[in-house]
Every structure is written in structure tokens, then in C-alpha cells.
């Protein structure tokens, strides 16, 4: 347990941030899963639409520092490659 007043405050702030980030991370994963589900069904149009919704969210989470910018780029590139493979 925190001993000083500032340590207690920092513990409270840390817990608030943890919960907020957990919510955002869950939202990010949900949107990525929607794209993957659309890809697995083989529907190119649905996958493209889901990717168009997920792409700015992935970028936003990278900007906020929730995920690394390289991870965001990697996720988008891999999803886009899978969508393009559907069209071929």
C-alpha cells in the first residue's frame, strides 16, 4: 500500500489509466476481429468496409501510445494483404 499522499494519488491515477487503456485495447481488438471475420467469410466487400472502419482506429491507438506505430503499420499491412488476396 502507498505510504505517502502523492503515492496514493499516483496509484489511483495509474488504476484509472489502466482501466481506460483496457477499454480502448478491447475496442481495438474488436474492430480487428471484425475485419478478420469478414475475411474468413470470403466477402471482399464486407472485409473492405470493415477494414475502412478499423484502419483509423488502429492509427488513433498508435497516436495515443496504446500500441507502437510499427505494430499499427504491421497490422494494417497484414489485414490489407489478406483482403487483396480475396480479390485475386
Curated annotation (Swiss-Prot):
The keyword RNA-binding applies. Residues 1-27 are annotated as: Disordered. Disulfide bonds: none annotated. GO terms for biological process: translation. The keyword Transmembrane does not apply. Keywords: Ribonucleoprotein, Ribosomal protein, RNA-binding, rRNA-binding. GO terms for cellular component: cytosol; small ribosomal subunit. GO terms for molecular function: small ribosomal subunit rRNA binding; structural constituent of ribosome. Belongs to the bacterial ribosomal protein bS20 family. Binds directly to 16S ribosomal RNA. This is Small ribosomal subunit protein bS20.
Amino acid at each position: 500500500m502507498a505510504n505517502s499522499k502523492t503515492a496514493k494519488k499516483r496509484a489511483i491515477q495509474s488504476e484509472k489509466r489502466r482501466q481506460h487503456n483496457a477499454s480502448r485495447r478491447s475496442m481495438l481488438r474488436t474492430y480487428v476481429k471484425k475485419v478478420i471475420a469478414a475475411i474468413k467469410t470470403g466477402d471482399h466487400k464486407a472485409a473492405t468496409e470493415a477494414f475502412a472502419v478499423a484502419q483509423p482506429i488502429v492509427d488513433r491507438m498508435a497516436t495515443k501510445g496504446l500500441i507502437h506505430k510499427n505494430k499499427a503499420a504491421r497490422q494494417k499491412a497484414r489485414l490489407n494483404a489478406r483482403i487483396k488476396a480475396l480479390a485475386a
